[in-house]
């Protein structure tokens, strides 16, 4: 309802201001946009989903609205997609917004918080729990409109050169990780380093870092991380849901006709569903291949997870005390998390835990 209401309000705004708007917004004339991403083309699920989204927009608008996608580094560096969208270098960009917590830590709610909402919960909060409205109000300050456009689901905990048997093993660990996850781990002695995707493998290979996380088995295999580190840990508690987002320059968004806006939002919603389905299909197969290649699967010890959980919520409380933006969104997020977890504990997790246990037994 809230998404539909947003589109209705946007359409009303277009009609009310048609006289003073560019001709494009009045006539539905052809539009050509450039889209910068943070992804290399080798990541065919992530970058490929962006390409498919662009094609879908064209289909929905009889080819009048064309968006051309570019891999990370082709127009701007992978970690500068936000800036390029904000300053109008490109009309839009596709990225993980937690790369930009240095601008405002509250942007992390868009991509997902450690020990927070899972993929389905994130989608529910964004679309029907008030999350999208709060995040759009935040991003508007930078002249950006965010549109959820994909989700990679829960992540793995990364590849490590050494085993992690205790909290002490985290101290001094040079770890490729971005976002609030890095801030949380720094409390436990980790040295977090935000490195672009294409630089992860060479950094791990030459020993510039001791460990690296990216997404999950399919993409991690694509990057070849298993060739330079053998211990593969789980779960990736820092992102139980990693939503990726289309950032749109607000001026360019406001210049679009209502039908083009609707097409773009519809294509992004479709991309979210299909991206999750692709990862859920491809990750199991990739995990089997990695294990067959000699990768050593390891679960983070419970004391390590407990320490990280404590540090995570201490970090959130500290940020809420310093940032009015963070506090406002955190209050909404916390309530939704508590309510949603109650339902998941009663139904989803009870059934899942039982069937997982039974599937591990001989029939």
Spans of features found by a protein language model:
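N-terminal secretory/targeting leader peptides
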Residues: 2-122, 130-363
